[in-house]
């Protein structure tokens, strides 16, 4: 149908060239249907999980912030959620989970007992794999892997 040449405006050099053989006239594009959990997981390179941290002598906000920092540096999309008393924790978790986020939930024992709908992507046994920041982050990273590929250091390509 025709040829094209792309020229860089700054350097005035040829950036690309090609041949158009046919025109796609279909009405739908790359994503057919709605953007759902699977699409978000594929784009982010991670599966949404909620990791429950119950406050104790060892587990405090600083500890969870350190875990979040390690995960964030590794390219995970994280959110540290420390709800105040009276918040609808289950509703907030539902929305964060739909968004494809790794949620680090810092709660006291009473709040932990009040949470409904703990799904298969709700992790409470993280301490069985160690209690050091790096060990916990490695366990969460493993649990939030999308498919077979593990994204590290923001390397999505």
Region roles according to the model:
Residues 54-58, 82-84, 106-110, 127-130:
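Structural motif
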Residues 63:
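Hydrophobic positions on the alpha1 helix immediately C-terminal to the Walker A/P-loop
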Residues 76-119:
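Conserved nucleotide-sensing/catalytic segment adjacent to the nucleotide-binding pocket
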Residues 15, 32-45, 138-157:
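C-terminal accessory "lid"/substrate-recognition subdomains
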Residues 1-57, 66-69, 73:
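C-terminal effector modules of nucleic-acid-centric enzymes and ribosome-associated factors
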């Amino acid at each position: 149908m025709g040829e094209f040449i792309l020229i860089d405006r700054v350097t005035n050099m040829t950036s690309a060239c090609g041949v158009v053989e046919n025109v796609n006239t279909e009405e739908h594009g790359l994503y057919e249907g709605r953007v759902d959990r699977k699409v978000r997981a594929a784009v982010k390179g991670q599966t949404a999980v909620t990791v429950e941290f119950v406050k104790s002598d060892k587990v405090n906000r600083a500890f969870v912030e350190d875990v979040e920092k390690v995960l964030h540096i590794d390219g995970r999309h994280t959110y540290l959620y420390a709800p105040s008393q009276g918040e609808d924790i289950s509703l907030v978790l539902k929305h964060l989970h739909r968004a494809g986020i790794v949620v680090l939930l810092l709660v006291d024992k009473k709040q932990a007992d009040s949470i409904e709908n703990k799904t298969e992507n709700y992790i409470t046994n993280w301490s069985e794999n160690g209690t050091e920041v790096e060990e916990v982050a490695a366990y969460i990273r493993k649990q939030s892997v999308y498919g077979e590929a593990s994204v590290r250091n923001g390397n999505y390509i």
